[in-house]
């Protein structure tokens, strides 16, 4: 699973996931399912915010390419992926500036158009069950919840899906692709079932060629959202090095 994750996701997402796990004393090499889940969640958060801006009139627009000098503001503030201290600093700043209620738990995003925090969920189970778990934990009507599944289902607070259908379809397609790639390599069952995960871990430890059969191509396109995060946690030289550090399987 670890090798699959390192080839399936952008290196910067992988590093953010590793930092998040280490912050809680977790090892990506041991808790590989959690590693995969965190990388997936990070990517969904970044895809959620990609290309969405607010123009000078305060209208929400989608811009995939255009005039870099245009007066545009990112519609979403990304909170997920930052260390806890920085994340709470961002949340406090937003609350002080906008007057919105401070959440009890760190949310994933802030929507400047709707003036609300957003909690993003990615589940391997039924969306409505995971939605209720999130809602019971957060216990706040102020934080908007949006849940995606690997089967293309989604659920959001008051059926308000925030994004346009095409943007959500990109997220769903990516999740479905991840599921199919895992399934084709016999990793999906262990990703869903903790018992199967333990069995798979023992099998992986005995394997002499953990890379065999894994994809060697990864998208080199850096998410616009990731670009906005880069200055806060790495310099340009380190970023360039990470982009070039895609894991390659050893040749026989």
From Swiss-Prot:
One GO-annotated biological process of the protein: viral RNA genome replication
Q: Does the keyword rRNA-binding apply?
A: no
Q: Which residues form the active site?
A: 80, 108
Which keywords fit this entry according to its UniProt record? Answer: Decay of host mRNAs by virus, Eukaryotic host gene expression shutoff by virus, Host cytoplasm, Host gene expression shutoff by virus, Host mRNA suppression by virus, Host nucleus, Host-virus interaction
GO MF annotation list: RNA binding
**Location of site Important for efficient shutoff activity?**
202-203, 206
Q: Where does the protein end up?
A: Host cytoplasm; Host nucleus
Q: Where is the signal peptide?
A: none
Superkingdom to which the source organism belongs: Viruses
Cite the position(s) of the site with description Important for efficient shutoff activity and nuclear localization: 195, 198-199
Q: What is known of its domains?
A: The probable endonuclease active site in the N-terminus and the basic amino acid cluster in the C-terminus are important for the shutoff activity. The C-terminus acts as a nuclear localization signal. The C-terminus is recruited to host protein complexes involved in nuclear Pol II RNA processing.
UniProt similarity note: Belongs to the influenza viruses PA-X family.
This molecule's function is given as: Plays a major role in the shutoff of the host protein expression by cleaving mRNAs probably via an endonuclease activity. This host shutoff allows the virus to escape from the host antiviral response. Hijacks host RNA splicing machinery to selectively target host RNAs containing introns for destruction. This may explain the preferential degradation of RNAs that have undergone co- or post-transcriptional processing.
This chain belongs to the protein called Protein PA-X
> Which species is this record about?
Influenza A virus (strain A/Duck/Czechoslovakia/1956 H4N6)
